[in-house]
Amino acid sequence: MKNIAIVGLSSFGFYLCRKLSAMNYNIMTIDIKEELVNQVKPYVRKAVIGDAKDKAFLQKLGITDFETVIVSVGNKIDSSILITLYLKELKIKEIIAKAVNEDHAKILDRVGATKIVFPERDIAIRMAHTIDNPNFLEYIPVDEDISLIEIGVPSKWVGKALSELNLRSKYGIQIVIIKELIPPRVTVPTGDFILKDSDILTVIGTNTQIKEIQHKLD
């Protein structure tokens, strides 16, 4: 069982620890605010009140027993940088740090973060795309040029096999997963899969190709 420590119980840290605990990870949380620590106690193996900016405190706590440490200290840029530096000095294998902007991310990278996340930015981007096109049930950027989207089955595609639609040749996109509601299951489809109006498609393509599909769905 993987041991994960979460430093900082911002909204991001709080919901992350609840989800990881539900997935049966051993979670320890650290925050300087007692009320936040008390809120998370029912969900984690260990919840500690303390200042993670104190390197000696981290050592005494046994932070080196954790393979992964997630730094989620809200918008406290100086705190997250210092904590990340200490974790690097303590030879934590995986340090995932939350950044609030690109400059913050650059510094986190330099002081030792192995992965940097932008939860607010990423949620805003996804929401903007789903607002821009209500046909997109979900939008997930893979990198700067490639995205995943979830869409319902367009009426023109219902009752047709994927091989007949030939989406890759026509539009350059590929359906990688289909969520079926009747019966409920998730399928990695083959060319002979017949689309139903109740299916939900996970589609991958370049942003240009996704934009073209967007116009087809309007």
Segments (PLM) and residue ranges:
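Cytosolic regulatory regions of ion transport systems
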Residues: 1-218
